[in-house]
Curated annotation (Swiss-Prot):
PANTHER family: GENERAL STRESS PROTEIN 20U. This is General stress protein 20U. It comes from the Bacteria. The keyword Plastid does not apply. Keywords: Stress response. Belongs to the Dps family. Transmembrane segments: none annotated. The keyword Magnesium does not apply. Induction: By heat shock, salt stress, oxidative stress, glucose limitation and oxygen limitation. One of its GO terms (molecular function) is ferric iron binding. It holds the Pfam family Ferritin.
Length: 145
């Protein structure tokens, strides 16, 4: 198995681990007229994120990789950053949109690496995540106007 592919998948474990905590922060601290809508949306997203973390980590183990499993490693490795803690509702949505945009590009890179080594299973897993976040980003962009 390609070490580059293992690193790319591990980066996604780190990204989604940071997103999981960030989305909880947003779920708990969102305020304003869109509270009910965003509170539910952030919960939906962190539940989905939990599935990604587990699926990606287990795939790494199946490939004899070692998934990142601490917040310290996740924060050091991830392309996305944790929540600042004082965002407005609109800033929260913009941040998730921006993070998903970064992750989508990295997923494409991972799909290319999987294709190069003939790992259809990993490629399909990354594609499924990519499809989901593209749909979420369409909705988040519509919310932002």
């Amino acid at each position: 198995m390609s070490e580059q592919l293992i690193q790319a998948v591990n980066k996604q474990v780190a990204n989604w681990t940071v997103m999981y905590v960030k989305l909880h922060n947003y779920h708990w601290y969102v305020k304003g007229k869109d509270f009910f809508t965003l509170h539910e949306k952030f919960e939906e997203l962190y539940n989905e994120t939990a599935t990604y973390i587990d699926d990606l980590a287990e795939r790494l183990l199946a490939l004899n990789g070692k998934p990142i499993a601490t917040m310290k490693e996740s924060l050091e490795t991830a392309s996305v950053k944790e929540a600042a803690g004082n965002e407005t509702a609109e800033q929260m949505v913009q941040s998730v949109y921006d993070d998903f945009t970064v992750i989508a590009e990295e997923l494409k890179n991972g799909m290319d690496l999987a294709d190069e080594v003939g790992d259809e299973t990993t490629g399909d897993m990354l594609l499924a995540i990519h499809q989901n976040i593209e749909k979420h980003n369409w909705m988040l962009k519509a919310y932002l106007g």
